[in-house]
Design a protein with these regions (language model features):
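Small/polar-rich, solvent-exposed N-terminal microdomains that initiate assembly or binding
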Residues: 1-76, 181-183
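Short, cationic low-complexity segments
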Residues: 79-80, 172-183
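Acidic-leaning, charged glycine-interspersed low-complexity segments
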Residues: 103, 113-162
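Short, charged, solvent-exposed linker or helix-capping segments at domain edges/interfaces
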Residues: 65-68, 166-174
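"Short basic amphipathic alpha-helical interaction patches in structured regions
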Residues: 69-71, 106-112, 126
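Short beta-strand/turn micro-motifs at beta-sheet edges
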Residues: 77-83, 144-145
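Oligomerization/assembly interface segments of phage tail-like spikes and tubes
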Residues: 84-102, 108, 150-161
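Residue-level signal for secondary-structure boundary sites
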Residues: 63, 102, 163-167
């Protein structure tokens, strides 16, 4: 089963912008927040004194899909249109580089759970993404780059992502099936 990741990725980017107080289409957001490269060994390295945030969304290998069905049609209409919601567990991996790496990681960790209009949690919830409360504190590391050191903060947040699948219409019990009788 294949699900498009784009709407979820857009919602995560928007939530990061809300956490950091940046406009979604701002130049600062585009320079600061990046999706992780598929081949990290070939990824360009930002300057040591520049802040940058890389992130990726990985499905939890121990994730068993949980499905629920919802029937939005009122009773007695004769048709049932069933929407099935499948929930999968994901890990949101965030790696912050630069002098303010720890501050950014802590800010994302604390702000991601704020609710209300325009706040990160609502942005995620509207896209069917639900952060699991109480993530661990970010791990602070120092990477050697040549003869210099780069500050790094790693943060992992567990998410439940809900996908919507529209099932076909089915006849209700109220509408009698067509029966052909041959003699």
């Amino acid at each position: 089963m294949f699900f498009s990741k784009k709407p979820h990725h857009t919602a995560i980017f928007d939530a990061f912008c809300a956490c950091l107080g940046l406009g979604r289409g701002s130049r600062e957001a585009a320079a600061l927040i990046h999706e992780a490269y598929a081949e990290p060994e070939n990824a360009p390295r930002p300057p040591r004194n520049r802040n940058v945030i890389y992130w990726t969304l990985l499905q939890d290998p121990a994730s068993d899909p949980v499905s629920t069905a919802y029937n939005p049609e009122p009773a007695g209409t004769g048709r049932n249109s069933v929407t099935v919601y499948t929930t999968l567990k994901y890990q949101l991996i965030i790696v912050c580089y630069g002098p303010d790496a720890e501050e950014y990681a802590l800010r994302i960790r604390s702000m991601l759970y704020l609710d209300g209009s325009g706040f990160p949690r609502r942005i995620l919830r509207e896209a069917g993404i639900y952060p699991v409360p109480d993530p661990p504190q970010p791990a602070i590391l120092y990477e050697e780059e040549g003869s210099l050191w780069r500050k790094r903060a790693d943060l992992t947040i567990s998410l439940r992502v809900q996908y919507e699948i529209q099932a076909g219409e089915r006849n209700s019990i109220i509408s009698a099936p067509v029966v052909n009788i041959y003699r």
